[in-house]
Amino acid sequence: MSKKALLMILDGWGLGDHGKDDVIFNTATPYWDYLMETYPHSQLQASGENVGLPDGQMGNSEVGHLNIGAGRVVYQDLVKINLSCRDNSILKNPEIVSAFSYAKENGKNVHFMGLTSDGGVHSSLDHLFKLCDIAKEYNIENTFVHCFMDGRDTDPKSGKGFIEQLEAHCAKSAGKVASIIGRYYAMDRDKRWERVKEAYDLLVNGIGKKATDMVQAMQESYDEGVTDEFIKPIVNAGVDGTIKEGDVVIFFNYRNDRAKELTVVLTQQDMPEAGMHTIPGLQYYCMTPYDASFKGVHILFDKENVVNTLGEYLAANGKKQLHIAETEKYAHVTFFFNGGRETPYDNEDRILVPSPKVATYDLKPEMSAYEVKDKLVAAINENKYDFIVVNYANGDMVGHTGIYEAIEKAVVAVDACVKDTIEAAKAQGYEAIIIADHGNADHALNEDGTPNTAHSLNPVPCVYVTENKEAKVADGRLADVAPTILHILDMVQPAEMTGCNLIK
């Protein structure tokens, strides 16, 4: 008899501290209690670097399902770059090697430009400092930093401090602050080319207020009532840091939307009517892919294509699969679970159950869970699927309302649906793995007793429903779920999946 597996994702169903805030623990869940007493279970980490997010950041449904389906940790750009700086693998990055080797061999200037703040939305000071260190290592004669000031993701007068930090770092590393301008000009995203031209003229033609002390120049701008975001162009009078033919430019913003327009006028398209022309022979490096249509630019950290996800691998091996959820979590069990792919694979069926039309889900805490369960049980009884993934949305969607009584009702509904689903699956010879993508209903109150509507940092359960009395399940993270499913199906794990089978 061929093996079959059911993966049940209870959205927002974390393992709480059993205090008053832990609605799941404090609500009567007879079937969940039976599962915990009867079957092997463990804990999975579902937040921070365990799911490819910055350390200490709570997990979310998109990232959770991506990691679950991928069978590996899928790192966000910021985390990928952070890790590369931390373990020094950035030094072996072929584009980094090409940029600095070219500058060294041809005696060219190196320019770093980007948002100079610790806001963490578009860029990171740590990345800029690391680039300065690499320039020092390559012994580059002229390294210039062009600072775009923030004031949106940071306090409006914090920029002066960032320039002080940068100058202190450059003093022991490499680089000089060549120019300063507000992000209002350098990082427009609405085709206001007259703003972009202010930045272009500063970078290429050295047009701006001349200053010998860049920190003092920032203070003077504040004194005139002009804060970081709107700082008018400032030029360091002590250096010629303009961008010239054949120079190396590294734009260190990792978010693409506000890095595109300046890149366009420097590298992609002449705008004679606005007095802007691309610069010949520029060796231009973007931190991440800014736009698929850009030609002739280098990319330091390219987008990862997540290949051989669980869905793709099952399809390639001729297995039949079903993905089912209500509207609120349908994209999660399809698009995100399949690594960012919209189209179903061969032999992949999908069932979408409409979520209830209510203003907020505390008005209908059971949501469409019973309808999902009925359709799912019917599909299980057809006995044609090798693999089924289902998401019950209530713990998360009702958890976000912060209304305790509603969350209790949501938990009761999920418990009832889990029972009917698992009993049907057992009767048809399925083994099941029950997990969550992140916590929420397990932490419904803040310490002061006010409602907490956010996700939790708690680990999530992993229950293995099996007839095998000897089985044990190890602790792990969400990336270990797909390899565990493949183990149940007696399939070899593909090389791209770096997670571990948790069944011992």
Curated annotation (Swiss-Prot):
Keywords from the UniProt entry: Glycolysis, Isomerase, Manganese, Metal-binding
Q: In which pathway does it act?
A: Carbohydrate degradation; glycolysis; pyruvate from D-glyceraldehyde 3-phosphate: step 3/5
Which reaction equations make up its catalytic activity? Answer: (2R)-2-phosphoglycerate = (2R)-3-phosphoglycerate
List, alphabetically, the Pfam families matched. Answer: iPGM_N, Metalloenzyme
Q: Where is the active site?
A: 61 (phosphoserine intermediate)
The residues that hold Mn(2+) 1 are 396, 400, 455
What InterPro entries would the database entry show? Alkaline_phosphatase_core_sf (IPR017850), BPG-indep_PGM_N (IPR011258), Metalloenzyme (IPR006124), PGAM_B_sf (IPR036646), Pgm_bpd_ind (IPR005995)
Ligand binding (Mn(2+) 2): 11, 61, 437-438
| Note on cofactor | Binds 2 manganese ions per subunit.
Q: Name one GO molecular function term.
A: manganese ion binding
Keyword Isomerase belongs to the record: yes
What the entry lists under HAMAP family is as follows: GpmI
Q: Give the quaternary structure.
A: Monomer.
Which family would the database say this protein is a member of? Belongs to the BPG-independent phosphoglycerate mutase family.
- Record-linked NCBIfam families: pgm_bpd_ind (TIGR01307)
In UniProt terms, what function does this protein have?
Catalyzes the interconversion of 2-phosphoglycerate and 3-phosphoglycerate.
Q: What is this protein called?
A: 2,3-bisphosphoglycerate-independent phosphoglycerate mutase
